[in-house]
């Protein structure tokens, strides 16, 4: 364990904070050989308990300062720096653990007492510093034990050589440049007050002490104390030799929000507090660029995204230094500075003529322009665009093309314009990609044919826009991804507005079609899908019969009328003259069709049927229809094996039609239809119409008798 021999009285007093001063019974600055000589060995007394070890007993006179301890401390710090150990982290045990271990295994020699006192002193410093930072600033060099073991192994035979070396080293290292005069009486705070009083001053003094000692260790080790905002200072603000003056941190009204001007020995630079970015130039004139920050380039590694996405080691990139013009958009997020191409403006500084063209385009409300750069396209399947999966698939395409390791300027990547700056225009319901220099149209995509569009959801990908559409030549689905200069949600919002406008126009067009005030010339390309309710198919029964023909009759009802017509036709014609045909019976219509030619021989409405009956022969069937005012016609049929099925079907159609007429007629309106049976009519209309119903009943009675005859 090495103890620095060049401590300032003010630094030690700042650490003690007025605690009880303790003196060590042994000179901590004496050489090894001086402590081990015969005189000291004869007079040295081992303390009986820890209280005497802490220096509360008698105190002998301290010996002269020894420069060899300083040499050992510097050598051990140099070796620790070579082994890449963190000099700002203390790996010593706690004060209680060290005290218990030292009490059990304390050596009985004077050299063991010297190590005990030095360790107690350093433990007090560590406990005080741990109160503020959680870890002390003092380095435990006890692990560098091989040097100490070599000294013990060498024994007294090498003491004479060490005396000669000490004399030479004292001449070189007795007064190193920049170090104050050594102190002989070093006071170390003890008790609980040393752990609680003034943790801020403890940390500053300890940082000053070991920062100065490390600065003298070696040239290559001096780089650990960088000049960034995270590095410890070499002293407290009250010290006159501090590298930081009281006005080191300044906030100027000329600086943007979040910026601070920092002054130190390296110069004046500007610190952006939210992101931790530093730059030499004032932030008002240019944003931070690579190569201008005093921080190390390793600090630009994208580490925040690694925990979220779990990329492999090769997926993290650093921003390469760029010598191009600074960005026009000001300070960007720190994640965006680590993308695969340099964090610069997607388009160079426009010439005044180009600015005028852009302003003219933006002035036109029908055209919206966005500066983009094509990252390529990825082939997709129809299953990936299913509801609930399309958003995940599009985001995966954005992630794949945004963070891949290949060169984005490679023309084989599938990007429009070979990775150069483009203009994405939304004009006349069309998405266009235009080359900004010569206004060459590279691609035109109708917005109505775009299946899906979206914006990157990952951290730092809010400037990535993608849309999915079917290629005209290959008919495959492609997801095109673009890196936008402005937030990509602006493009998505504009597309949403255009689609809403298109849907509104189509709804208005449908309303015009329904109102029969439509200009068909404007709706040639608009597909209309009008769904009409399917017509209800009525039950139709077909019967194979022989059609005997039709004859006019004098009365609309009567079995004798039907029998007379059937007898006249059967007597005047033979079976060969009958026409084979089909009779289709529907609830509304009776249709007679030719069996071979399907020609319509007759069509009768059921509502005009006045009477039906089966003839004297069970194979014959006939019904009377009203052909006009006071004009009636009788249609006759020959059925096989009998006419029962046909007569029942026609009777059922008549009953269904009659029921529909009753349902459609209002209760107060009168009807010209034949009345139902007398009993039901009497219940409805009362006794006032009984006489009229009875007269109708007389006309319907022969119908019932005729329908029951075989």
Swiss-Prot record:
Q: Where is this region: Disordered?
A: 143-256, 276-300
* Organs and tissues of expression: Expressed in the brain, retinal lens and muscle cells (at protein level).
Q: Which gene encodes it?
A: Apbb1
Compositionally biased spans, kind Acidic residues = 145-173
Q: Which Gene3D superfamilies match?
A: 2.20.70.10, Pleckstrin-homology domain (PH domain)/Phosphotyrosine-binding domain (PTB)
User: Taking every annotated instance into account, which residue ranges of this chain make up the domain PID?
Assistant: 370-509, 542-699
- Taxonomy, superkingdom: Eukaryota
Q: What is this protein called?
A: Amyloid beta precursor protein binding family B member 1
Per its record, what are the GO molecular function terms? amyloid-beta binding; ubiquitin protein ligase binding
Say yes or no: keyword Signal present. no
Question: Which GO biological-process labels does this protein carry?
Answer: apoptotic process; axon guidance; central nervous system neuron differentiation; chromatin organization; DNA damage response; double-strand break repair; extracellular matrix organization; negative regulation of cell cycle G1/S phase transition
Name the Pfam families for this protein. Answer: PID (PF00640), WW (PF00397)
Query: Null phenotype?
Result: No phenotype in normal conditions. Displays an increased sensitivity to genotoxic stress and exposure to DNA damaging agents. Knockout mice have decreased muscle strength, however clasping ability is unaffected. Impaired spatial memory retrieval and learning. Reduced branching of hippocampal neurites and increased fragmentation of neuromuscular junctions. APBB1 and APBB2 double knockout mice show progressive retinal lens disruption from 1 month of age, morphologically lenses show massive vacuolization, lens capsule rupture and disruption of the lens fiber cells organization.
Function as written in the Swiss-Prot or TrEMBL entry? Transcription coregulator that can have both coactivator and corepressor functions. Adapter protein that forms a transcriptionally active complex with the gamma-secretase-derived amyloid precursor protein (APP) intracellular domain. Plays a central role in the response to DNA damage by translocating to the nucleus and inducing apoptosis. May act by specifically recognizing and binding histone H2AX phosphorylated on 'Tyr-142' (H2AXY142ph) at double-strand breaks (DSBs), recruiting other pro-apoptosis factors such as MAPK8/JNK1.
Q: Which SMART domains match?
A: PTB, WW
Taking the record's annotation, the residue ranges forming a coiled coil are: none
Its assembly, as annotated, is: Component of a complex, at least composed of APBB1, RASD1/DEXRAS1 and APP. Interacts (via PID domain 2) with APP (with the intracellular domain of the amyloid-beta precursor protein). Interacts (via PID domain 2) with RASD1/DEXRAS1; impairs the transcription activation activity. Interacts (via PID domain 1) with KAT5/TIP60. Interacts (via the WW domain) with the proline-rich region of APBB1IP. Interacts with TSHZ1 and TSHZ2. Interacts (via the WW domain) with histone H2AX (when phosphorylated on 'Tyr-142') and the proline-rich region of ENAH. Interacts with MAPK8.
Phosphotyrosine occurs at 547
Reported modifications of this chain: Polyubiquitination by RNF157 leads to degradation by the proteasome.
What ranges does the record list as Polar residues composition bias?
223-234
Q: Which keywords annotate this record?
A: Acetylation, Activator, Apoptosis, Cell membrane, Cell projection, Chromatin regulator, Cytoplasm, DNA damage, Membrane, Nucleus, Phosphoprotein, Repeat, Repressor, Transcription, Transcription regulation, Ubl conjugation
- Phosphoserine is found on 135, 459, 517, 610
């Amino acid at each position: 364990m090495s103890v620095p021999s060049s401590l300032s009285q003010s630094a030690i007093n700042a650490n003690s904070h007025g605690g009880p001063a303790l003196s060590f019974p042994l000179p901590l600055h004496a050489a090894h050989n001086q402590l081990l000589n015969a005189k000291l060995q004869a007079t040295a007394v081992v303390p009986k308990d820890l209280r005497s070890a802490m220096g509360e007993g008698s105190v002998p006179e301290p010996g002269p300062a020894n420069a060899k301890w300083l040499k050992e401390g510097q050598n051990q710090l140099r070796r620790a720096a070579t082994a890449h150990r963190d000099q700002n982290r203390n790996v010593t045990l706690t004060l209680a653990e060290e005290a218990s271990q030292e009490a059990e295994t304390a050596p009985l020699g004077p050299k063991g007492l010297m190590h005990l006192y030095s360790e107690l002193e350093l433990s007090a410093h560590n406990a005080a510093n741990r109160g503020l930072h959680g870890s002390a600033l003092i380095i435990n060099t006890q692990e560098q034990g091989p040097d100490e073991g070599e000294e013990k192994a060498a024994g007294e035979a090498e003491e004479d050589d060490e005396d000669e070396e000490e004399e030479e080293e004292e001449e070189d290292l007795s007064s190193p440049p920049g170090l104050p005069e050594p102190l002989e009486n070093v006071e170390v705070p003890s008790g609980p007050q040393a752990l609680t009083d003034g943790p801020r001053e403890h940390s500053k003094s300890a940082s000053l002490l070991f920062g100065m000692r490390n600065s003298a260790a070696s040239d290559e080790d001096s780089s650990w104390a960088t000049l960034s905002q995270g590095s410890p200072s070499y002293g407290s603000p009250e010290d006159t030799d501090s590298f930081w003056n009281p006005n080191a941190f300044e906030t100027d009204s000329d600086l943007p929000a979040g910026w601070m001007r920092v002054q130190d020995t390296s110069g004046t630079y500007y610190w952006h507090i939210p992101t931790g970015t530093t730059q030499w130039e004032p932030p008002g004139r240019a944003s931070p660029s690579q190569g201008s920050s005093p921080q190390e380039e390793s600090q630009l590694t994208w580490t925040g995204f690694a925990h979220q996405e779990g990329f492999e080691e090769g997926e993290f990139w650093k921003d390469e230094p760029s010598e191009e013009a600074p960005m026009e958009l000001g300070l960007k997020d720190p994640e965006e500075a680590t993308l695969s191409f340099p964090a610069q403006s997607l388009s160079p500084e426009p010439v005044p003529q180009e600015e005028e063209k852009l302003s003219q385009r933006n002035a036109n409300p029908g055209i919206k322009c966005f500066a983009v750069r094509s990252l390529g396209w990825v082939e997709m399947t129809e299953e990936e665009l299913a509801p609930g999966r399309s958003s995940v698939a599009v985001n995966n395409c954005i992630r794949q093309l945004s963070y891949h390791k290949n060169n984005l300027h490679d023309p084989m990547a599938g990007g429009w314009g070979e990775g150069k700056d483009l203009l994405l225009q939304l004009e006349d319901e069309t998405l266009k990609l235009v080359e900004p220099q010569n206004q060459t149209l590279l691609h035109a995509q109708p917005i109505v044919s775009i299946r899906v569009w979206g914006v990157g959801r990952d951290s730092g990908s809010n400037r990535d826009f993608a849309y999915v559409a079917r290629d005209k030549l290959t008919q495959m689905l492609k997801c095109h991804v673009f890196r936008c200069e402005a937030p990509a949600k602006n493009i998505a919002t504009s597309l949403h507005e255009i689609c809403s406008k298109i849907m509104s126009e189509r709804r208005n067009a449908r309303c015009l079609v329904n109102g029969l005030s439509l200009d068909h010339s404007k709706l040639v390309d608009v597909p209309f899908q009008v769904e009409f309710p399917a017509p209800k198919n009525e039950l139709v029964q077909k019967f194979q019969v022989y059609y005997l023909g039709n004859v006019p009759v004098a009365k609309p009802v009567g079995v004798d009328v039907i029998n007379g017509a059937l007898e006249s036709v059967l007597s005047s014609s033979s079976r060969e003259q009958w026409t084979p045909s089909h009779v289709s019976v529907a609830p509304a219509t009776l249709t007679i069709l030719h069996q071979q030619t399907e020609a319509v021989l007759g069509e009768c409405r059921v509502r005009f049927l006045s009477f039906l009956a089966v003839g004297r022969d069970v194979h014959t069937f006939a019904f009377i229809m009203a052909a006009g005012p006071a004009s009636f016609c009788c249609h006759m049929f020959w059925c096989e094996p009998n006419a029962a099925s046909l007569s029942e079907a026609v009777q059922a159609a008549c009953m269904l039609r009659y029921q529909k007429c009753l349902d459609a007629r209002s209760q107060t309106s009168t009807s010209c239809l034949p009345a139902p049976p007398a009993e039901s009519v009497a219940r409805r209309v009362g006794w006032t119409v009984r006489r009229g119903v009875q007269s109708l009943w007389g006309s319907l009675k022969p119908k019932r008798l005729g329908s029951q005859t075989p």
